[in-house]
Amino acid sequence: MKRTRDEVDATLQIAKLNAAELLPAVHCLGFGPGASGAAAGDFCLLELEPTLCQQLEDGHSLVIRGDKDEQAVLCSKDKTYDLKIADTSNMLLFIPGCKTPDQLKKEDSHCNIIHTEIFGFSNNYWELRRRRPKLKKLKKLLMENPYEGPDSQKEKDSNSSKYTTEDLLDQIQASEEEIMTQLQVLNACKIGGYWRILEFDYEMKLLNHVTQLVDSESWSFGKVPLNTCLQELGPLEPEEMIEHCLKCYGKKYVDEGEVYFELDADKICRAAARMLLQNAVKFNLAEFQEVWQQSVPEGMVTSLDQLKGLALVDRHSRPEIIFLLKVDDLPEDNQERFNSLFSLREKWTEEDIAPYIQDLCGEKQTIGALLTKYSHSSMQNGVKVYNSRRPIS
């Protein structure tokens, strides 16, 4: 039954509201035939920040990603968000075409009664919270079948695991841009339309070909010509693999129309250290540093600073030792990461632990804030150290 203006005025009097202080237009709400279905969960409300609204209005998509055993996340083209249900104390009404007070002010309305049909209602909505992308699974998938070279028997096995970009977008809880960035970090490349990580021994084989050629030709590490590399090394390995190796360990540039690569000494020294450390549980630090320096190309200088997030030095053992500890092998969850680190070593200096928690920092979070939340600090021999806030089993 539709209300008349007299009934509306009578209601205002009962509520002791002054009509002069209100907009003249009146919404009279009534439930439509579809309201019960909408309230039963056929629809849900999603609160979006202005930039995401603009992306939708521009024709872009937002994607919800996650397997059945994972907490769903929402992804834009370049960001990842947690989805959280927020309950409300007031009923939220779905009213198609409902005009806001600002819209009504712009209209020439004289005591209009607007009969509005409620399409549905809800006591909660989904809200988004920016989060780090869940990228650990990406390396796990690609390491199921690392690329060992064109002559590997595994390449002839049609049942081996391989993933296209679409496969990764379907399985990784991260935005497309974040996935593509991480593929670069992992030094992944496309082979036959599938993303692959090079098996480390094969990667080092390629790198040795390049550094030996640089040495034999007496080139500067800052100016390695691409075309000559491909011509000389092409008979040994596929040209696309040689170029990929140069991209992984150097920076591409053009000089007088020719393509060159400036090799990164830190990356090459780091790779050589990993090669030495991966076959030893622990390595005498002094002996390691001597062998390491001998294993890198002449002219490059090794430094322990090159090994942050790759290896850890134990200064308290006698003799001092070094061992492999890769940050990408540690848990992705904050608390699990700290538990893992504190089970390995009871007390850490900030200098030692920083490379292993840097990737946990959010947009506005610092290493100091993470340490305050997950550890206690104390002084030991004049040096600030950090230990776990909770017992480690």
Swiss-Prot record:
Q: Name one GO molecular function term.
A: DNA binding
Which Gene Ontology BP annotations are present?
Answer: DNA replication; maintenance of mitotic sister chromatid cohesion; positive regulation of DNA-directed DNA polymerase activity; post-translational protein acetylation; regulation of DNA replication
Return the InterPro entries for the record.
Answer: Dcc1
Where does it reside?
A: Nucleus
* Domain of life of the native organism: Eukaryota
Q: Which GO terms describe its cellular component?
A: chromatin; chromosome, centromeric region; Ctf18 RFC-like complex; nucleoplasm
UniProt-listed Pfam families: Dcc1
Which family, according to UniProt? Answer: Belongs to the DCC1 family.
Quote the PANTHER family the UniProt record gives: SISTER CHROMATID COHESION PROTEIN DCC1, SISTER CHROMATID COHESION PROTEIN DCC1-RELATED
Q: How does it assemble?
A: Component of the CTF18-RFC complex which consists of CTF8, CTF18, DSCC1 and the RFC complex. Interacts with CTF8 and CTF18. Interacts with DDX11.
Protein name as it appears in the record = Sister chromatid cohesion protein DCC1
Name of the gene encoding the protein in the UniProt record: DSCC1
